[in-house]
Swiss-Prot record:
It is found in: Cell membrane. Belongs to the UPF0182 family. It comes from Salinispora tropica (strain ATCC BAA-916 / DSM 44818 / JCM 13857 / NBRC 105044 / CNB-440). This is UPF0182 protein Strop_3729. Pfam families: UPF0182. HAMAP family: UPF0182.
Length: 994
């Protein structure tokens, strides 16, 4: 029965219009892709990494075609088969009458419809598959780790290299079968193979055989999924123990359940085929079989493990989960390279400044006073010379040996900041052909200030004269090629066009100011970097890419021109090594006379069995993130290695990748994937370059944060969580919630033979503010070393936040700080350094002052120092030398230090510290009102100490206010009593904690 109503048809003009629009869209899309691919090929050719471009491109195309074609064939083949199996005769019914209209529409072009659906499905599947290029390359080129998982004895390499791609293939197979099943079901229904109305069998024999086969394949895939789930269980979170990896209930209940369900799935798949086609030939028993599978999955795979977890594990979780917590601890320490951390006890029992502070040559002289974040503004104002030069929001720390002395320097490069060009300077010609580069690496010793608090600059001069004593008169870190064409300030659109057609023509690029008269020199780029854009075809290509007609119209682009782009060092490394996670803080160094950017590269994975999984962005974010350091992507990982040290030449952009961790299987797999020679072996690292390697910041932050929990190796203690640590907040702004960044120092830690350049950080116990440990990362003989100095649990040594508050809340010091901040000047605090010394702890915190004048910059004016518990011995001095002298004097006046306490004793309180101005004569006794006032001061001091030890900051504030009031009352009483001399002060310093 056919309907008399014809189906609407589109007019010829409408079809032509749609065809033209689709054609234009496809043309422009292909043009954009083509231009991007061509320019990428040229760029990779410039940096000599075409193997990466071609390898990734070929892999993506291979996956796109293979998976897309397979998906199209599976879906399209089942659509064709369903149509091929349609019944020739269909009983008449209202349902079939309605479907007849659709059959009339589809039948004339049924092949076209099936092809269209297949192409669309294949296109989406291919696009999804091509993004899995990294998983495929690791699957093809991965090897063994040489370490087996603790449950199945399978090499870790299977989980890192094979399992991710197997899971993707399984997911793709599920998608293909489901789409084929839905498509076949629809075709069978439209063409009468399935009927919802009428009498007799509702499904033809052919349709039943077809659909039951697809269902059986789906169930067989589910069996494979159950098998893979057994391996995947070692990667999942264990709520019962708060660690990753299979726990007691997983191993003893869920693991056998998965195996049983896999067997049941195979049986059900066979039953579906047999009951649907060979025996009974209906859907009742296949339906019952599928229902039994569902019930089994709920009962065996859900209820049973839940019951074991609830009634067997939870009542004694500490004991039941101990074995699996131990697995997680061992795996996590291995995956994050924490197993080799050298943990030692540091008693820190000396609470009084030792006399050796004044004669030390390893720790005190190397205490860094310049904060690379604060003095960036100072560098810009004093070394900018022109308004468009910039040093960025944060400088870097490196070490150099000058005149036989090695120390750390604050370094920065004078880059072009295109955002600071004036309106006249920022036209296309000036922006891209004149202001093309910066000039010079500017450095200053990190422990020295001159001329009212300025850094003592020793390099990067532009020929200007500096006041004698305020800067070195000769370049102490000379660079034979100081020009900066590639730097951190470069963004996506900051390309430069260099080169001149006529060798006799005057240089067009602004080079640098010369002399005191404001004259300028110009320059022509002669480096090997850049893509040649002299031909018309190349100029047209980049005109399309940059959407800029001046590539074709401007005379500044000539036959000798080169285009420099992707000029950010970090982005260059990411582009040539897309398999690396790049550290967020590149730093410059002068290597063989050239300014070179050094960037740390990490290999990561997320499928290390039993290892803790972290979010890389969360674990590396602190106060400096997006303030001079790049923020990492939100990537979940549970394995990381600093496998590569990369360099980028600041002049010609040359990118070099050096192997640093020669034992990393992940790096070996990537190197193999790209021909085996992509990364230079470790033996080829130049000695001068390796001398500037530093422990990478992001890796250290990850290791530090993970170690705050996984330093606990006893499963029972780990489960209770009582010994966990935390990273303290920024000392001078604890309420901001930002974590204190680690800091680089050239210093000597306890047990070290000589000073090293190391990255250090303090950690505190959970929910407490005293110091728990110091962590240090450094290189010894070219190998990374992580060291931890753990303090006793009952230590009185304060943590960074507490120390800063104790120092700045000292009555005398607070008065001086208030004077510094008068006239709306800003008092800014530099890095608070925690330095183990003399079996105690020395704290150093530089104090900067920035006036309220326009274009003012921070100047180092004072240095806060503390020794011991953080509050008993505190000074605010003009410089480090004077501060150390005052600390030593306080220690001498306080008397000989008490012997270290035994393990079962509480460390004795130090003798109260007299103020530096207190004479050593015995004061006369106090009487009357003065004596009462003195007693109130003493009582306030006792309360202040108690509040400090309790860690209750609200109580501490009240006690501090009471001390101020008592001190003021005492001074007033002493002034009104002639017999009371200034020496008749109450015993005990009124400083916090004193």
């Amino acid at each position: 029965m056919r309907s008399s109503a014809p189906m609407p048809r589109m007019s010829r003009r409408g079809r032509v219009t749609i065809g033209v629009l689709v054609g234009v869209f496809v043309l422009f899309t292909l043009l954009g892709w083509g231009v991007q691919a061509w320019t990428d090929w040229l760029w990779f050719g410039e940096v000599d990494y075409t193997a990466v471009f071609s390898g990734v491109l070929v892999t993506r195309l291979l996956l796109f075609v293979t998976v897309g074609l397979a998906m199209a064939v599976i879906v399209g083949g089942n659509l064709w088969l369903a149509h091929r199996l349609r019944p020739r005769l269909r009983p008449q019914s209202p349902e079939q009458a309605t479907l007849e209209r659709y059959r009339m529409l589809l039948s004339p072009r049924i092949g076209l419809w099936f092809a269209t659906v297949s192409v669309v499905v294949g296109l989406f599947a291919g696009l999804s598959a091509q993004s899995r290029w990294s998983e495929w390359l690791l699957f093809r080129n991965g090897g063994n780790f040489g370490v087996k998982d603790p449950e199945f004895g399978v090499d870790i390499g299977f989980y890192i290299f094979d399992l991710p791609f197997w899971r993707y293939l399984l997911g793709t197979a599920f998608t293909a079968v489901v789409l084929a099943l839905l498509g076949a079901l629809a075709v069978h229904y439209v063409f009468g193979g399935i009927r919802l109305q009428g009498v007799g069998d509702r499904m033809s024999t052919a349709a039943r055989a077809h659909l039951s086969t697809l269902v059986a394949v789906f169930v067989l895939l589910k069996a494979v999924a159950y098998v893979l789930d057994r391996r995947t269980m070692l990667l999942e979170y264990n709520d019962g123990a708060n660690v990753y990896g299979a726990g007691y209930a997983d191993i003893n209940a869920l693991l056998p359940a998965k195996e049983i369900l896999a067997y049941i799935s195979v049986v059900v798949a066979i039953a579906v085929l047999v009951f649907s086609n060979a025996w009974m030939r209906n859907l009742v028993w296949p339906g019952i079989s599928l229902a039994l599978l569902g019930v089994s999955a709920v009962a065996i795979g859900g209820i049973y493990p839940w019951a074991v977890q609830t009634f067997e594990v939870k009542p004694s979780a500490r004991d039941k989960e101990a074995r699996y917590i131990e697995r997680s601890i061992e795996a996590t320490r291995a995956a994050f390279s924490l197993g080799e951390a050298d943990a030692t006890r540091y008693a820190a029992s000396n609470l009084q400044p030792p006399a050796s502070l004044a004669t030390d040559t390893a720790v005190v002289p190397n205490a860094r006073l310049l904060d690379p974040q604060l003095v960036s503004e100072t560098y810009t104002q004093l070394q900018q010379v022109r308004g468009f030069y910039d040093f960025g929001p944060k400088l870097d720390i490196d070490r150099y040996t000058v005149d036989g002395e090695t120390q750390d320097y604050v370094v920065g490069v004078r880059e072009i900041n295109y955002g600071e060009l004036t309106t006249q300077q920022s036209n296309w010609i000036n922006r891209h052909t004149v202001y093309t580069h910066g000039y010079g690496l500017v450095a200053a010793p990190a422990n020295r200030v001159v001329c009212g608090g300025q850094p003592y600059f020793v390099s990067g001069f532009l020929g200007e004269r500096s006041q004698e004593g305020c800067a070195a008169q000769t370049d102490q870190i000379p660079a034979s090629q100081p020009r900066i064409y590639y730097g951190e300030r470069m963004e996506a659109g900051d390309y430069a066009i260099v080169g001149k057609a006529n060798p006799e023509a005057s240089p067009a690029e602004f080079d640098r100011p010369v002399g005191e008269d404001g004259s300028e020199s110009y320059y022509t780029y002669t480096g090997s970097g850049g893509v040649e854009v002299g031909s018309f075809g190349r100029r047209l290509l980049y005109a399309i890419k940059e959407q800029e007609s001046n590539f074709l119209l401007s005379e500044a682009v000539n036959e000798k021109s080169k285009l420099l782009y992707v000029r950010n060092p970090r982005e260059r490394v990411e582009k040539v090594a897309p398999f690396l996670t790049v550290d967020g803080d590149p730093y410059p160094a002068v290597i063989d006379g050239r300014v070179t950017w050094i960037i740390d590269g990490y290999t990561t994975a997320a499928t290390y069995p039993y290892a803790e999984r972290i979010n890389l962005q969360t674990e590396t974010t602190d106060e400096l993130t997006n303030r001079g350091t790049f923020q990492q992507a939100r990537e979940n990982i549970n394995y990381i290695r600093n496998s590569v040290k990369a360099t980028v030449d600041a002049y010609d952009g040359t990118v070099t990748l050096y192997e640093f961790d020669d034992g990393d299987p992940v790096l070996r797999a990537w190197n193999k994937a790209f021909g085996g020679d992509l990364i230079k072996p470790k033996a080829e690292i130049p000695t001068e370059l390796s001398a500037h390697f530093r422990y990478p910041a992001d890796l250290f932050k990850v290791q530090r944060n993970v170690y705050t929990r996984f330093h606990v190796t006893n499963p029972g203690d780990f489960y209770s969580g009582q010994d966990f640590w935390q990273v303290p907040n920024v000392p001078d702004a604890p309420d901001s919630g930002q974590k204190q960044p680690p800091y680089y120092l050239f210093t000597q830690m306890p047990g070290q033979d000589e000073p090293r350049f190391q990255l250090t950080s303090a950690v505190t116990p959970n929910r407490r503010q005293n110091l728990a440990a110091l962590m240090s990362g450094s290189y010894v003989d070219g190998k990374p070393r992580l060291e931890v100095y753990e303090l006793p649990e009952d230590t009185r040594i304060s943590g960074p936040v507490q120390v800063h508050q104790q120092m700045t809340n000292n009555a005398q010091i607070r008065q001086q700080l208030n004077l510094l901040s008068s006239n709306q000047a800003q008092v800014q605090y530099g890095n608070l350094l925690s330095l183990p010394f003399g079996n105690g702890m020395l704290y150093v915190e530089p104090v900067y002052v920035k006036s309220n004048q326009q274009q003012a910059y921070p100047l180092l004016q004072k240095v806060l120092l503390s020794y011991g518990d953080g509050g008993s011995f505190v000074v605010l001095a003009d410089n480090l030398t004077d501060g150390i002298k005052q600390l030593v004097e306080q220690g001498e006046q306080a008397g000989a230090p008490s012997p270290p306490p035994s393990d079962d004793e509480t460390p004795p309180s130090p003798t109260p510290t007299p103020t530096p101005t207190t004479p050593s004569v015995t004061p006369p006794p106090l009487t009357g009102e003065v004596a009462e006032a003195a007693q109130r001061v003493q009582a306030a001091i006792v309360e202040l100490r108690a509040a400090q030890e309790s860690g209750d900051f609200e109580r501490y504030g009240r006690a501090l206010q009471a001390l101020d009031e008592a001190t003021a009352a005492f001074e007033q009483a002493a002034a009104s009593t002639p017999a009371a001399t200034p020496t008749a002060a109450p015993t005990g310093s009124p400083s916090p904690g004193g």
